A protein has these predicted regions:
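Noncatalytic, beta-rich nucleic-acid-contacting surfaces in large DNA/RNA-processing enzymes
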Residues: 1-205
Length: 205
């Protein structure tokens, strides 16, 4: 909100030949958006659009990373395919009691829907290949990070990356032993997400 002009300022501006539109603006708004700022916004929008067209996987990987930092990317919801995404979008659109969190989730769902429509796919989360926090590009697909699993925080995600170094696990049990910060609940989340592939629960024969 503008705070107007201090006493005498308008008279001084008129005397100095300042245009009426500028004086009027000073009375109404606190900040005048400069042309250079507007140009910078346009250039940034052009860069983003260029990446979206010519390097789409890099664009989506960066976008999903930013959304995940705010808890706006849930791998359980986002990696289920086109029909699943559309069903979740419809559920929020038709919910008269949708919360601000739901609306924020809807934004991500719509971009993921576009992602699928363009023929792209997510690679399954992998205990060996997923990053703790970054979305990676792998074999023409996007590989979600560990934190994309709802309820699995950064501490556990980084512990997974550290614990797997130089390892060739024989079982899910071995993963658990190598990653002490990853709780049993987290391990079940990873298992449900398919992160362990064909690893058996234990190393016992």
């Amino acid at each position: 909100k503008g705070k107007g002009l201090p006493p005498g300022a308008e008279e001084e501006m008129v005397a100095a030949g300042v245009p009426d539109w500028y004086i009027g603006s000073c009375k109404k708004i606190k900040y005048l958006f400069p042309k250079a700022h507007a140009v910078a916004y346009c250039m940034m929008a052009f860069r983003i659009a260029w990446f979206k067209v010519y390097h789409p996987l890099a664009f989506y990987a960066a976008y999903f990373y930013r959304r995940s930092q705010k808890g706006g990317f849930d791998a359980g919801l986002m990696t289920g395919g086109l029909e699943s995404i559309l069903a979740n979008i419809d559920a929020i659109d038709n919910n008269a009691d949708a919360t601000a969190k739901d609306e924020d989730l809807l934004t991500t769902l719509e971009v993921v829907y576009e992602f699928y429509l363009r023929g792209f796919e997510f690679a399954p989360i992998s205990v060996y290949e997923s990053h703790a926090t970054k979305f990676l590009i792998k074999d023409g697909k996007i590989l979600p990070p560990f934190v994309a699993i709802s309820g699995l925080g950064e501490s556990a995600a980084w512990d997974l990356m550290e614990g797997r170094k130089g390892k060739n696990f024989l079982s899910i049990e071995e993963v658990s032993l190598a990653c002490p910060k990853v709780s049993k609940t987290h391990m079940q989340m990873l298992k449900d997400a398919g992160a362990f592939g064909s690893l058996p629960d234990t190393s016992q024969v």
